[in-house]
């Protein structure tokens, strides 16, 4: 990694890989010095047009890995309730369909794709080919991350690549005309340099920042006010203890006070999880200048369809709150329209 520190820095300054201090904490923040040739946002114009009118509603797609049928099943509850789905990495399922192929499967289900690309699994040649394929597939945007170390996921036996890091990947994606977002962890050390770090990624070509959980709406608002690009904070979706355990494992993730307890102590954690996520999402959408929200969480194997239904309930409510309008398209389907239509 050249442009660190990544988001995997613990509150005590430790690296997520092992019991040692992040080496970047004692160094000046690396500055972006590379040039960039941006060909235009391509298919990203649709998202930019929406973002100019109202906050974006994005969600994860909780499909089982390497399962096209699961993608179809989990896409149905989200169709028409989100502006795009984030098809990114998964800590418990490192082996996924390649981003461009997965994007095509999702697009076939009528959803825009915000495709996640990490630097852990491919060298720069393979990454460039993947970005070219995503641009050709017409994805709405790409989310460029360095990627979690494999020691912390479902395939600790895999060798990490990290030929590039997220900042250099951003520049490469921008050259292909892709609309680019990056990740940031506002609560991870060095906290005082996190917005500057986003600034360096913006200089490389990033247009949005998706935020790791960093507390309540006040904490998000404080970070957003100083961030050089529009932000999409995360709305944590918890419906059971396994999902709560996964979110607690994220480095430097800070959930709103009492968030998890309110859900797990309820008689119906699923219903409570939906209610709490909607209320928190609405609070985030009220932050001035917010670009949108990303609803996501941990899902137990086999529970993907139920989790997708819950996500759809949350995103439907947040879409209406954000100013979008929903109308029936079929017996059990919805499509998004502008309020004036």
Kindly give the residue locations of the regions a language model identified:
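Active-site pocket-lining/capping segments in soluble small-molecule metabolic enzymes
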Residues: 4, 45-50, 63-65, 147, ...
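Conserved, mostly hydrophobic/aromatic
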Residues: 85, 134, 201, 205, ...
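Cysteine-cluster motifs in flexible loop/terminal segments that predominantly coordinate metals
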Residues: 1-38
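Conserved N-terminal beta1-alpha1 strand-loop-helix module at the mouth
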Residues: 40-84
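Acidic (Asp/Glu)-rich catalytic clusters
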Residues: 48-51, 73-80, 100-110, 131-139, ...
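Catalytic beta/alpha-barrel core
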Residues: 60, 84-95, 116-119, 142-145, ...
